[in-house]
C-alpha cells in the first residue's frame, strides 16, 4: 500500500478578490483521501502564512498549498526554498502571476483537482536585497504603483489600471547604473524589472520568453515614453510582444547590481517595500519544488496568430504616428527658415 503524503493548505481569508468561503468544503470533496492526509490552516495576520509554512516544512509535510493571491504565494514559497517540501497553489488573488505562468487552472475546483496528480518539479527563484521573489521584482514606476495599489482600499485589475492612468504621465523617470558580468551602463528608465517568470499577473507579460528553469533572470529596462507611446506599450504587455517595443531593452543574467541616486521603493511579487539606493538581485537555480500542471508545466510565452495580428496593427499605427511626428518636425524647421528669410526682406 502506498504511503499517504501529508499536505497542508494555508488559506488567507482576506487576499485577492475571490471569496474562499467554500474552499475548505471543496478540499474535503476533491482531494483524494487515499493519497493524502489533509490539514487546513487559516492565516490571521501578515506574515502568518510564512510562519505556518516554515513550521510544516520542519515537520516534514510533503506539500504546502498557498490558497490566496501573489502575496500569500510568496509568503508560503519563501519558507519552502531549499527544503523537500513542495509548494502548491490554489489561485484566489487579483493577479495570480506565478499560478498563471505555471498554467495552474484559475478555476478553484480544477486547481484543487490538479493536486491529486502530485507532479512535482524544481524551479528557480530570485532574491532582491535578501527578499525572495518567484515571479518579478521591480523598481521605478512599477514599484511606485505597487505602493499606491497597496494603499488603495480596493483590489483587482481595474484599481491597478486606474492608478497607472492617474500617475503614469506625472511620474519622473530616474537614472540607474546597471551592472552585470559584462560591465556597467547608465540608463534613464521609467522602470526596471527583473523577471524569473513571464508575467506580473492578469496575463500582463513583462517578459514573454522568461522561464523558471534556465538559471537566469530576464532584465527589462523601459525607457521614458510619451502619452502617444502608451497604447502601444499596453498592447505589447498583454499581447506577449513587449520585447519588440522600441522603448524596451532586455537581456539575461544570473546576477545584477543596480545603483540609483537615493533610496526608494521596490516590489517583489507585487509586495512593495522601501529599500536602499544600492540593489542586488540574483537567481537561485532549482531552489524550490513546485506542484505543477501535468498537462502544461510552464506558459510558453509565445503570442498566437490573433495576438500577432493585433500587435502588427498597433505597430503600423505607431509607424504612422512617428512619420507624422517627423513630418511635423520638418515643417517646423522649414517654417523657421522661411521666417528668418522673410525678416531679412
Q: Which residues does each predicted region cover?
A:
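ATP/NTP phosphate-donor binding region
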Residues: 1-64, 297, 307-319, 332-345
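Catalytic core of DAGKc-family lipid kinases
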Residues: 10, 33-34, 82-86, 90-194
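ATP/nucleoside-binding phosphotransfer catalytic cores, i.e., glycine-rich phosphate-binding loops
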Residues: 20, 221-345
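Short glycine/serine/threonine-rich phosphate/pyrophosphate-binding segments
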Residues: 49, 71-76, 97
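N-terminal glycine-rich "phosphate-gripper" loop used for MgATP/nucleotide binding
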Residues: 66-70
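Short hydrophobic-aromatic micro-motifs
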Residues: 131-137, 186-195, 200-201, 218-221, ...
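Internal anion-binding site segments
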Residues: 180-182, 188-253
Amino acid at each position: 500500500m502506498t504511503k499517504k503524503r501529508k499536505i497542508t493548505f494555508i488559506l488567507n481569508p482576506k487576499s485577492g478578490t475571490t471569496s474562499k468561503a467554500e474552499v475548505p468544503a471543496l478540499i474535503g470533496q476533491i482531494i483524494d483521501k487515499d493519497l493524502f492526509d489533509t490539514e487546513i490552516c487559516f492565516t490571521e495576520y501578515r506574515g502568518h502564512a510564512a510562519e505556518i509554512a516554515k513550521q510544516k516544512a520542519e515537520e516534514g509535510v510533503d506539500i504546502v498549498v498557498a490558497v490566496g493571491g501573489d502575496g500569500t504565494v510568496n509568503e508560503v514559497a519563501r519558507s519552502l526554498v531549499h527544503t523537500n517540501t513542495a509548494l502548491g497553489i490554489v489561485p484566489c488573488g487579483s493577479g495570480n502571476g506565478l499560478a498563471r505562468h505555471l498554467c495552474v487552472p484559475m478555476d478553484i475546483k480544477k486547481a484543487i483537482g490538479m493536486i491529486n496528480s502530485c507532479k512535482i518539479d524544481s524551479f528557480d527563484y530570485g532574491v532582491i536585497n535578501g527578499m525572495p521573489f518567484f515571479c518579478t521584482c521591480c523598481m521605478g514606476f512599477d514599484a511606485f504603483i505597487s505602493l499606491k495599489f497597496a494603499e488603495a482600499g480596493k483590489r483587482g485589475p481595474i484599481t491597478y489600471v486606474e492608478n497607472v492612468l492617474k500617475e503614469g504621465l506625472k511620474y519622473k523617470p530616474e537614472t540607474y547604473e546597471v551592472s552585470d558580468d559584462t560591465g556597467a551602463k547608465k540608463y534613464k528608465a521609467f522602470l526596471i524589472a527583473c523577471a524569473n517568470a513571464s508575467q506580473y499577473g492578469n496575463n500582463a507579460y513583462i517578459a514573454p520568453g522568461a522561464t523558471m528553469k534556465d538559471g537566469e533572470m530576464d532584465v527589462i529596462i523601459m525607457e521614458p515614453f510619451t502619452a502617444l507611446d502608451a497604447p502601444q506599450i499596453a498592447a505589447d504587455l498583454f499581447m506577449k510582444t513587449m520585447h519588440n517595443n522600441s522603448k524596451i531593452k532586455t537581456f539575461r543574467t544570473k546576477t545584477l547590481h543596480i545603483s540609483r541616486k537615493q533610496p526608494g521603493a521596490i516590489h517583489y511579487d507585487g509586495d512593495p517595500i522601501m529599500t536602499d539606493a544600492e540593489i542586488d538581485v540574483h537567481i537561485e537555480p532549482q531552489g524550490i519544488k513546485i506542484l505543477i500542471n501535468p498537462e502544461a508545466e510552464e506558459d510558453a510565452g509565445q503570442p498566437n496568430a490573433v495576438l500577432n495580428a493585433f500587435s502588427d496593427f498597433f505597430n503600423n499605427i505607431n509607424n504612422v504616428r512617428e512619420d507624422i511626428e517627423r513630418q511635423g518636425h520638418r515643417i517646423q524647421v522649414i517654417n523657421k527658415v522661411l521666417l528668418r528669410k522673410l525678416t531679412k526682406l
